[in-house]
Amino acid sequence: MKLLALVALCAVGVASHRDKRQLSIGTISVSGAGGSTGCVVTGNVLYANGIRLRNLTSSEQSELATYQTEVEQYKTQLRNILSQRRENLRNRLMSQGRNQQQQSNDVSSQGGNDDGSIPKAPEKPSFCTAEDTTQYYFDGCMVQGNKVYVGGQYARDLSSDEISELQTFDTQQTAYQNAVQSQMQSQVQGLFGGSDFLSALFGGDRFNQQQQRQQPSSTTPASTSSTTLPPKPTVPQFCTAIF
């Protein structure tokens, strides 16, 4: 079993290869520890993945101030929910020796303030988009924001034709990677006995019902999609690495 899983993981790694894109979007750190990936603003200067972009406008500075307030509120809500859930868990463990009715009452009374929902993270500011932070790694260079970087140093801007070429490559590469992932899932499912094995492992009828909702017509198309992949997109030649 372990060998089969390892083979599947290796196949995914080979399919990805070096010309795949890397999407780097900044995340909110509840603990306060962060980094330079994604969008970073300091002194009203905007950076994307450590690369300086431009100064913020006055309206963008106001938008950033609103975002900072919302982030602090979001962090506070998360901490309160985590604290409440730790308290609920502690009460459940302490009440194991009591009778079932008493335990039920304790859990319901302590968990009344926790509805199980996680607050939604605030929307990123309009000046921090996926287009700003997406990095495309090719042999010898990296492209971000339609600019070419070599060894972390700015080299040049893409031409209008190259920008169109990159957009086409992005669309085709995304479709190719999705098809590879879908094929791998079908192959792994076949290796482990299909839905019967997974049903026995993960919960019987509930798993079957979920699979039927997600894949209502998976009987015939599965065999075709598992063997057919779109052509691998042609990698743009924005730079030449000499080996």
Swiss-Prot record:
Cellular-component GO terms for this entry: extracellular region
Keywords of the record: Disulfide bond, Glycoprotein, Secreted, Signal
Glycosylation sites: N55
Feature: compositional bias, Low complexity: 99-112, 209-229
Main location: secreted
Residues making up the signal peptide according to the UniProt record: 1-16
Region of interest (Disordered), residue spans: 95-126, 208-235
Disulphide bonds in the chain: C141-C239
Record flagged with keyword Glycoprotein: yes
CDD domains from the UniProt entry: API3
Protein family per UniProt: Belongs to the protease inhibitor I33 family.
Protein name, UniProt field: Uncharacterized protein F32A5.4
Organism: Caenorhabditis elegans
Taxonomic lineage from the root: Eukaryota, Metazoa, Ecdysozoa, Nematoda, Chromadorea
